A protein has these predicted regions:
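Terminal helices and disordered tails flanking the catalytic cores of nucleotide-processing hydrolases
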Residues: 2-108, 231, 239, 266-404
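Residue-level signal for pocket-adjacent positions within structured domains
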Residues: 12, 22, 31, 37, ...
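Short, flexible segments with low predicted structural confidence
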Residues: 18-23, 106, 113-114, 121, ...
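Short hydrophobic/aromatic segments of transmembrane alpha-helices and their interfaces
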Residues: 30, 157, 242-243
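Short alpha-helical linear motifs
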Residues: 129-132, 183-192, 243-247, 299-302, ...
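Alpha-helical scaffolding flanking metal-ion-dependent phosphate/phosphodiester catalytic sites
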Residues: 142, 163-176, 192-206, 210-293, ...
């Protein structure tokens, strides 16, 4: 990992944990109960517990490193991810045993309840993945993303169930993929690696046909999984997907790829959300522009307080997020301590955002201390309020034009 882009938080495998290390992230029980809070000092019993939980490793802080800021919603996001992963493991164990997947509807409804009707953007924080837990974490993250996107596109509950179920189960074939391939980045996969992945995904969905009559949403979800897995091999499909399924495939494809590109992985470094959105937008034939734009309405790409790399060669901090065009917020340029409104053509010609600085666990790096130096200033407060009001008017005007 390129250290200059990240803060000091370190990932340590459970085998290498030592008493006295401080946790950078909380550890939850499978039912969501907090076991160890952030900044907790690890003890020998705690290390044994971490190993018994099946954790690949944990994030620890440097000796003098402060605890990174996290909102209540961010903490709940991590808590729910933990709960969902354990519930998904239970579902996949039942599938492996060819037993009825009783917990599946509850898991799906829980995800949709929390993320399928949001009226605001969220911080899509990622967990570091290994070949051992990639399948579970990727499935959960993809299900959360498709739930948010489908909600913005006004899909009904049954359609959301179909999408979320497909997101959770389409990739169970990854369990058949060798570790050395799973640890690779998508841009380093050989042709033979991709063939192995394709064959594994096809093999994974084969046994799911036995659940067609178990749940009313499952036949449609299975058809979506097949349409997605065989998208590049339509000759293998018994029935071509209808228009609705084709639309769902587009949603699943964007969510799937965005998550894989931005997730931290032991084997390869992720790209930033900005880079991921650029890559998706550049391939409009494969990634639907409307879906990509809708994704940007669901999650923060360039949020307030984020540290940013600028085209001028220095860094800046986002003061006011632009909810209409995330690449054109109001920023504080640290090189000259001046405010620039990138929604202004004059300012945008001078400065553009190149990328975002990230933490080791792929969070947006938030420079709260630097912000504190400027926010109390009355002039800056007035300017920031002015820019926020201006951006809000632009946003409202564009929404009105879209509605017409």
């Amino acid at each position: 990992i390129r250290r200059e882009r990240y803060l000091n938080m370190n990932f340590v495998r459970t085998d290498h944990l030592k008493a006295g290390m401080r946790l950078a992230k909380p550890i939850y029980h499978k039912n969501g109960v907090l076991l160890y809070d952030r900044n907790s000092v690890l003890t020998e019993p705690g290390i044994i517990s971490a190993r018994n939980f099946g954790l690949v490793g944990v994030y620890v802080l440097e000796p003098a490193e402060p605890v990174p800021p996290l909102s209540r919603e961010d903490l709940e996001f991590e808590q729910l991810q933990t709960v969902y992963i354990f519930q998904l493991r239970e579902c996949l164990d039942l599938i492996a045993k060819r037993k009825r997947i009783e917990p599946l509807p509850k898991l799906l409804n829980n995800i949709i309840q929390h993320y399928g009707a949001l009226d605001h953007r969220v911080n899509f924080n990622q967990n570091l993945r290994s070949s051992e837990d990639f399948m579970y974490k990727h499935a959960i993250s993809t299900a959360i993303l498709v739930s948010m996107i489908s909600s913005r596109l006004h899909y009904d509950h049954q359609q959301q169930l179909t999408l979320a179920a497909a997101a959770l189960l389409y990739d169970i074939g990854y369990s058949h993929v060798p570790k050395n391939i799973l640890d690779k980045g998508s841009d380093t996969l050989s042709t033979s690696d991709r063939e192995v992945l394709q064959h594994a995904l096809e093999r994974g969905i084969e046994p799911l046909g036995m659940y067609r009559s178990d749940f009313d949403f499952f036949p449609r979800a299975l058809a979506l999984m097949q349409a997605y897995v065989y998208a590049d091999y339509p000759e293998k499909l018994a029935i071509m997907p209808d228009e609705e399924l084709q639309g769902m495939v587009k949603i699943l494809r964007v969510a799937d790829q965005f998550d894989q590109m931005t997730a931290m992985n032991i084997g390869h470094e992720p790209v930033s959300e900005i880079s991921a959105m650029k890559l998706l937008s550049a391939d409009a034939t494969r990634y639907d522009k409307q879906i990509v734009a809708t994704l940007a309405e669901c999650i923060h790409i360039v949020p307030q307080a984020a540290n940013i790399d600028l085209s001028t060669g220095d860094k800046g901090i986002v003061l006011v997020e632009n909810t209409t065009n995330y690449m054109r917020p109001v920023i504080l340029r640290l090189g000259d301590n001046k405010i620039y409104d990138l929604s202004s053509e004059a300012d945008f010609r001078k400065i553009q955002i190149l990328d975002i600085m990230k933490t080791m666990d792929n969070r947006i790096s938030v420079d709260e201390e630097t912000l504190k130096q400027f926010v109390p200033d009355e002039k800056l407060k007035e300017l920031t309020a002015h820019f926020r009001e201006r951006l809000q008017k632009i946003h409202e005007r564009e929404n009105t034009q879209t509605a017409q």
